[in-house]
Amino acid sequence: MRSSATCSRRKARRRPEEDEPVNAPTPKAALAAPLPQRERPAEALPGPSDWSFELIEQYHAVIRATAERFGLDTYPNQLEIISAEQMMDAYASVGMPVNYRHWSYGKEFIATEKSYKRGHMGLAYEIVINANPCISYLMEENTMAMQALVIAHAAYGHNSFFKGNYLFRMWTDASSIIDYLVYAKDYVAKCEEKHGLEAVEDILDSCHALANHGVDRYRRPSRKSLAQELADRKDREAYAQQQVNDLWRTLPRKAEKEAAAETRRFPEEPQENLLYFIEKNAPLLEPWQREIVRIVRKVAQYFYPQRQTQVMNEGWATFWHYKLLNTMYDDGWLTDGVMIEWLKSHTNVIYQPPVGHRAYSGINPYALGFAMYNDIQRICEHPTDEDRQWFPEIAGTPWLPALDQAMRNYKDESFVGQFLSPRLMREMRLFSIVDDEHEDELEVAAIHDDSGYRRVREALSRQYDLGSREPNIQVWNVNLRGDRSLTLRHFQHNGRPLHEGAHEVLKHVARLWGFGVHLESVDAAGEIRKRYQVPGPAH
């Protein structure tokens, strides 16, 4: 079965890189208002529990036409029907259709399988991959109503977000990721054959432990095609080794040059991307090991935007599956039975347990994102005086362009900081708590009232700042003339110390660096509060 969207039982495709800008497709202008329905159907689409490929195509055609009426700009779609076991396999390999082998994926698969069989967890109805074409996995155990929900949610909601949001446009190349993963899988497999499973596994273990510290947070990476990458790899390996040799050259020097070298700091400025620094400068890594470090950090970079947009991304997909399927029902395409079935699932997804409820584990990103996009539409269509005061730039304006602008230009932190309204804070009964280490009790710092709106919004916005959730650890210095040790520096956020497992993570840094590693944890005043030290591995 093929169309501009395709439906089949599995497949794969491409890859990102450095040194060449991405030719991201120009985004379409948002529609000022939804387009009218073309014609009303004589009867609704069939709504049996069991699906068929033909029926999925019929539903998909109507969903696609409805999405076009709202101006959703998406990559071409590729739908894959997979089994529950394949869905668990996709879970274990971070949702990608192809990946290199690593024991952690097998461990995750077994844990997921056991929980699923014991009834302790359900499986996602879908997994969607930011690729061009956009790949959406539909589980074959789904009913037809759930397949329709998944197509609207993943193939049009997530897909349009991947294509439109600035973080994904800046940091990822959807047309190349699948080919890159194929390349990574083949390269790691060849390394296993040549150097042994244990040697490759050791490198991957350490790289995975440091993956979140292997991304560029502020500098936009440029990219090469897969063909360019393969052609340039040998030149890059030779050049990198030459640079390492130059850095660690130990030929005798004149006394004045030695004195200057003693005061030389390397790197001249702190470096935030630890894996990049190790790839380029670790003294003892072989070329194949550097390439594996590069592979892990490239994959980590691909997932970086997703870690910053969960509320926006899931909220956007939920908003659009709700909008598209309701529109289809109003237009006469869906039966009452199909409508009730997907609405039940939708209601469960956006449920927000109250504080104190045994199911409460924080704010549900689906609930918050869905509520915020609905609230933006309300502010545009039916603004109150309060809305006009808080959101003068969008109050009373067409809602489609306002929603499109919000989706494209924000991440979770700034989205909440810009668009969370007093009305929504009241409806969700939000409040802010301060946990002061010097106090015995928690303090309610602000509630959803006139004096607390901005403080509640700022506090919630900060929760989605990666800088407040992950430790800020930077490469500080390398002892070029002595023991070749590497010094890292941790900049505390709000006086928060590192996790007690920091020493174990440093062992992975030492394995990759090849020599001893020091870590200094400093407070806001720049004073060192704690030191960690790990010796280099035995050579």
Predicted regions and their residues:
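N-terminal accessory alpha/beta regions
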Residues: 103-130, 185-239, 243
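Short pre-active-site segment immediately N-terminal to the catalytic Zn-binding motif
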Residues: 134-150, 305-309
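Active-site His/Glu-centered metal-binding helix of metallohydrolases
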Residues: 151-160, 316
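Post-HExxH zinc-binding segment in Zn-dependent metallohydrolases
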Residues: 161-225, 314, 318-332, 344-355
